Amino acid sequence: MGFMGTHYPRLDEKGRLFLPAKFRDELADGLVITKGQERCLYVFPVAEFMRITEALRSAPIGAKAVRDYGRILFASAYDQVPDKQGRLTIPPNLREYAGLTRDCVVIGANTRVEIWDAQAWEEYLRAQEPAFAELSQEVWPTVS
């Protein structure tokens, strides 16, 4: 069914974060964490990351946007398996990129999980929610 919901875990001093219990099963065999858009982090199940990898691999190498996106995506990607307590370790460079502090927000975003700094997530919502109804007019025709 995909990842859904909003959760509020805390980052510990070692950069570890408890994954929400409802996400653990799908990520238990491995995940890839990397930079996302809007200064969040993307967490993909390995199978989904492989699907993205194949899509980028089949794109023309002459496409500059594909090369640029792929470089940043793959250079910042880390694969790992959550520990027995269901924690993932966020590397320092990714914590810095996303501005992660102690208070984080973990959201389900269908095929991926996103990790946000709590304040950045609140700012994003304040900026985006007024346009939510208008965006639905653009998005729904593409999915129905």
From Swiss-Prot:
It is found in: Cytoplasm, Nucleoid. GO terms for molecular function: DNA-binding transcription factor activity; transcription cis-regulatory region binding. Residues 6-48, 77-120 form the SpoVT-AbrB domain. The keyword DNA repair does not apply. Keywords: Cytoplasm, DNA-binding, Repeat, Transcription, Transcription regulation. GO terms for biological process: negative regulation of DNA-templated transcription initiation. Its main location: cytoplasm. InterPro entries: MraZ, MraZ_C, MraZ_dom, MraZ_N, MraZ_sf, SpoVT-AbrB_dom, SpoVT-AbrB_sf. GO terms for cellular component: cytoplasm; nucleoid. It comes from the Bacteria. The keyword Oxidoreductase does not apply. Forms oligomers. Belongs to the MraZ family. This is Transcriptional regulator MraZ. It comes from Acidothermus cellulolyticus (strain ATCC 43068 / DSM 8971 / 11B).
